[in-house]
């Protein structure tokens, strides 16, 4: 029996974040990863509380709004031996943080990104997030949303993410398996998680999702894994097409997986051969409290 942390979890009753938290904890435990080598990074929003509520001795970094992927990138590149997992809301990660989201994909850094997708800014009383569809009017909006929705899966595919999946917060066991695969994947991984907000999104509710979601694993012939270069384009196009399926039927599962693309860490090693053995976190930065960096020499070199 695992003893619970004496921390009050203040999410609203029925919040999809409970399922995400549980799936994430189980994924880390079942993979047998030393929790002390796991860093969970979050931004601002209801999802930002994940590191505080995680019932594992992980390292948590609760960062600035929209900057969690930037922080995670610095953590991973300074110490590639760590397992870095990012938790962002759809507003946090796909609004103010969209630039970082896109560039993580093109770099293909070995980081897993979990997007808590509920269509609203739940922490600030339910404004429309980038994933709320045009024409929808949730309870806090005075008028229907007039902007088109961001498609997280399609954006990730176009940006270069090499693992792209979608889960559902109320199907915890299925979500757990997706998170495990995202963590094990070598490269940038996205799990877009459909996460009902019972307080502010009265359209995309548990009842609404329950009769629409279906598993790609149950589709005859569905195979998202790229095993050889000549398959990549076909599997990519297949994933793009499937990512736009929304409405009466909503697919969950793995849309695309390609480990043939070298990670950013691999590419960095081609420029810095000893990077893997002597990465920044292993380097000495001070001697007796004095920095080893000689900035005076740098200033002299740059002085005009």
Curated annotation (Swiss-Prot):
Catalysed reaction, written as an equation: a 2-oxocarboxylate + 2 oxidized [2Fe-2S]-[ferredoxin] + CoA = an acyl-CoA + 2 reduced [2Fe-2S]-[ferredoxin] + CO2 + H(+)
Stored Gene3D superfamilies: 3.40.50.970
| Cofactor binding, note field | Binds 1 [4Fe-4S] cluster per subunit.
| Cross-referenced InterPro entries | 2-oxoacid:Fd_oxidored_beta (IPR053399), 2-oxoacid:Fd_oxidoreductase (IPR051457), OFOB (IPR011896), PFO_beta_C (IPR032686), THDP-binding (IPR029061), TPP_enzyme_TPP-bd (IPR011766)
Q: Does the keyword Coiled coil apply?
A: no
Q: Does the keyword 4Fe-4S apply?
A: yes
* E.C. code: 1.2.7.11
- According to its UniProt entry, what is the function of this protein? Catalyzes the coenzyme A-dependent oxidative decarboxylation of different 2-oxoacids such as 2-oxoglutarate, pyruvate and 2-oxobutyrate to form their CoA derivatives.
Protein name per UniProt: 2-oxoacid:ferredoxin oxidoreductase 2, subunit beta
Origin organism of this chain? Sulfurisphaera tokodaii (strain DSM 16993 / JCM 10545 / NBRC 100140 / 7) (Sulfolobus tokodaii)
